[in-house]
Structures are given as C-alpha cells and as structure tokens.
Amino acid sequence: MKKPLTHIAVVGFVMFALLFGSTSWVQYVTADSLNNNPLNNRRILDQLARDRGPILVDGTPIAYSEPVDDKYKYQRKYGSENLDPRAYASLTGYYSVVSGASGMERAAGDYLSGDSDALFYDKVGSFFTGEQPRGAAVELTIDPKVQQAAWDGLGNQNGAAVALDPKTGKILAMASTPGWDPNALASHDSTEASEAYKNLEAADG
C-alpha cells in the first residue's frame, strides 16, 4: 500500500508545483504586460475612477475628465467650444470602458492616469494625504490654427495631412478624414460605446 500512496503523493506534489509555478508566472513575470495592455478592461475600469489628466493644445483641453454621478466617477470628454473633437480624434484617440484606449490616450496613458514612475512623488503625496491620485496633463505641439486649416482642407475627401515646423521638427498639425467623434466611444453606456466602435471599424475597413 505504501508504494501507491507514495506515487499519489509525488503526483500531487508535481501538480501543485506546476499550478504554483504558472500562477507565479502570471503574477510576477507577465503582470506588467497584462496591466499595460490597452485592452485590459479591468485596468480601464480602475482608472476610470481617477481624475485622468487632460490632453492640451495651446493650453486648451481637447480631452479631459469631468466628475459624474455613476460608478465610474469620471466621464472622459473630447473637444471644446472652439475645437471640433473630430478634427483631433486621430491624435487623442479614445478612452473607452468597452474597447480600451488608442492614440495619445494609449501612448501617454501612464502619465494621464498618474501611473508613470515620473509621478512617483505625487503618488507618495497622495498616499499620505489620502487624496485620490490624479493624472498629469500632456501638452501637444499642435498649433490649433494649423490643425483647423488641415482639417478644413481635407474636407469630404478620405486622406491625411501633416505639418511640421521646419526648424524644430515639431508636429504642428496631424489630421485625417473621415473624422469621428471619440465622445461616443467614451460613453459609459456599453451598448452605445460598442455601437460607436463597430461604426469606427466599419469606416476604417
């Protein structure tokens, strides 16, 4: 009887070791890649409850968060009174509870969410004060007048336009058509956001 029991014990130990190893691999080795995946909606849900930093053009927000009275706490909004969100959509991208993030929302996501190591001291300060961590503002080199001119120039055509400062190489404008409104993708209504994403995919296809 001892040999079969010993065999079972060894098999059980090996299975436990494999299970522990795979769990450890996910927790410690792949954790960063999983957390930084723009399609990781669990991370998106966590960050939606934060005051995400704005994306600025010449000091004016073209993407910003407003407090709302729902489970997500903050609603991401795009454009302003004088800046058409469609003209900047190819730059800002979207930040969605359904489809993750794209554009600058993705590229500068760690700064906007407040997760960047560069914001370490801000995070420490928030920890001791008990305040909710806030994201940093990200300012683009875009000139709103040049951007509007590029957007207007494209009109109803399908295409893209980029303007650079010849001295510095800074991007002054980057527009593409057909345009789309990222506000629909940022909706907290999952049905509305999903429909907007399907429409965007259809337009790209």
Language-model features: locations:
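Surface-exposed patches in mature extracellular/periplasmic domains of secreted proteins
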Residues: 160-166
